[in-house]
Design a protein with these regions (language model features):
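Polybasic, glycine- and aromatic-enriched phosphate-binding surface used to engage nucleic acids
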Residues: 1-135
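Non-catalytic DNA-recognition/assembly elements of restriction-modification systems
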Residues: 121-206
Length: 206
């Protein structure tokens, strides 16, 4: 799901304004990522997905649309050619129960450092697998956006829920059930790709 972007930066003259926000003790920019030209030149403004390094809600990767910048508090994943199916299928794998299990074996609960995400293995996908997973992610996003279309404070707002042409389009329970089915298929696919069986997840939770 792509969230509303509630923070913006003035990039009219590049990172100069951000560089001017310094730590009073060191005199250096508060976020060192702004001092890395390679990051600015090679990664800013590209599509990808991000996650929270620390979260009590569990590991969750979210879409990062084009024309965004990021800092160390919100690490970001990119694909070499910014290819849509590559990004979406990878997001599916990283949001699977199998991937979360592998991450949980390496870190304390609620802590998801970039190094751990980087060294957690990702299975190789066939063209058909990549295409199917990308379709599932797009479908889940579309369902969530459908709900946001009736939320007046959302960037996706279209009309009040009472005016929805089809009641199911704005029914949170129906949408949640459909999204759960999508997640179940993603989880089953990821389990097979990693060579796990369903019991492996239950055994680890015990």
């Amino acid at each position: 799901r792509s969230s509303d972007l509630h923070l913006v930066v003035n990039w009219g003259s590049g990172p100069q304004q951000m560089w001017a926000i310094t730590n009073p003790t060191s005199g250096k920019p508060k976020s060192n990522i702004w001092m890395l030209p390679e990051t600015i030149n090679s990664f800013f403004f590209r599509p990808g997905f991000t996650w929270s390094r620390r979260s009590a809600k569990g590991l969750s990767f979210r879409a990062l649309p084009v024309d965004c910048v990021f800092s160390d508090k919100g690490p970001t994943v990119f694909c070499a050619d910014d290819e849509t199916d590559e990004l979406l299928s990878l997001m599916a794998i990283l949001n699977s129960s199998a991937f979360e299990l592998l991450v949980s074996l390496q870190m304390a609960v609620g802590s998801y450092e970039a190094g751990v995400i980087l060294r957690t293995p990702v299975p190789t996908l066939s063209h058909d697998q990549k295409s199917r997973l990308a379709q599932l992610v797009l479908r889940a996003w579309s369902l969530k956006k459908r709900l946001d279309a009736a939320v007046e404070t959302s960037h996706a707002f279209l009309l009040p829920a009472a005016l929805c042409k089809s009641p199911k389009d704005c029914d949170a329970e129906i949408v949640a059930a459909e999204v759960a089915k999508i997640q179940a298929e993603i989880d089953a696919t990821a389990l097979g790709l990693y060579g796990f069986v369903a019991g492996d997840l239950e055994a680890n939770s015990d």
